[in-house]
Amino acid sequence: MSYTSAKSRPSYQFDSLLEFKDAGLIASSGPAEVDSAEKIVDVGRGAFDGDMVIDVSAIEIGTGDEGYHIQVQGSDSATFASGVERLASLTLGDSIVTGGSADNAAGRRVLPFNNRGLDGKVYRYLRIYVEVERTIATGINFTAFASQRS
């Protein structure tokens, strides 16, 4: 095991205006919530480069086929009624779903993203959307916030 000094470890400043999901279990597909309401963050008209900090406190992998696709989505609609684009995605779950050599466990994940689509369009409104697949009993519990890169 090697030691990484505090100078070289990234730190992420929490800003409640950039909170995308608070603690709460997700057992079916849908948008993330803060205070029991769907959370949409307006990052303005310009480019936004950041890291989505995802702290997983619990993840169900009991039946061996669970999958959780955590997406950063952008839209030009403040309600996400139209123009929805997946900007970044993280897949967690059983190794059968993720294609990894081991099942995922609780812990911090950092997902780099920006608010530009593949066509170069800048999306002002952002949210987290979770797609849940296969046999789910309890689901996944995590919090998520964005940290803007300077």
Regions found by a protein language model. Give the residues of each.
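Surface-exposed, low-hydrophobicity beta-strand/loop segments enriched in small/polar/acidic residues
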Residues: M1-S150
